[in-house]
A protein has these predicted regions:
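PRPP-associated nucleotide enzymes
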Residues: 1-179
């Protein structure tokens, strides 16, 4: 099933495109020569990005849950909630950390998380950020990004199909071959 055409208001991304973006981001970080100790991804949007990158770089993955897009069916940014704890596979958050998310939109989340990490985790010696998309109106600048979007399109990521899918709908979904 093909995606609708993208325009200034909507950017449609399929699974293959999504994974190529993660690979391009990983290559960009690698080619920068920066050596980091851990990846910290922001859940939920950065989880897939962080998972793939932690496998490529063979470094521990930490997950920090954040949430601000709850209103208007997840399309309007509200107050930011940052989880009290970080889940990490080995050790604690320290040293050189690569903060990963799917995008920097307004930049508010990135700036608040950056401040939170610096205040709560003094063992972090260097913090850099990597995203797939950097929106032009953002107040924050990521260290690494794949696409800078001068406009402010809604990015339709491939996993958004699951946002409206419920367990009782799975059988029909599978039979239909919806993807």
């Amino acid at each position: 099933m093909s995606s609708p055409n993208s325009d200034d208001s909507h950017l449609w991304v399929n699974w293959d495109e999504y994974h190529r973006l993660i690979e391009r981001l990983s290559l960009q970080v690698f080619e920068s020569g920066w050596q980091f100790d851990q990846i910290l991804c922001l859940a939920r949007g950065g989880v897939r990005v962080g998972d793939v990158m932690s496998r490529i770089f063979d470094v521990p993955l930490g997950i920090l849950a954040t949430s601000s897009y709850r209103e208007a069916a997840g399309t309007k940014q509200g107050d930011l909630d940052i989880a009290q704890f970080i889940t990490i596979t080995r050790g604690s958050l320290q040293g050189r950390v690569l903060l990963v998310d799917d995008m920097v939109d307004t930049g508010k989340t990135f700036m608040k998380v950056h401040d939170h990490l610096k205040n709560q985790f003094p063992a972090i010696t260097e913090l850099r950020s990597a995203v797939l998309w950097w929106k032009g109106h953002s107040q924050a600048t990521p260290d690494y990004y794949v696409d800078k979007l001068p406009m402010n399109p809604w990015i339709h990521q491939p996993f958004e199909d699951y946002d409206s899918l419920r367990p009782h709908q799975l059988e029909a979904w599978i039979r239909k071959g919806s993807r």
